[in-house]
Amino acid sequence: MGEQQKMTIEEAIAILDPETRRAALFGYRYFGGFRGSEAVLAATEEACRVAVRVMQEYLEKKGGEPT
């Protein structure tokens, strides 16, 4: 991925939630140096990375073991 763009937790939720995914991804015609379907894929992958980070932080706070 070219330039790194920061994605908020709220943006990641909107992309990953089936109820809001289509509308959220509409604005991602350009993302991370990509365009079109590659930009949508890059945004979705970044949303997944954000979600994984949040879940790992949650597990650490709960005393679980992150992977």
Locations of the language-model features?
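Short interaction-hotspot residues at assembly and binding interfaces
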Residues: 1-3, 11-65
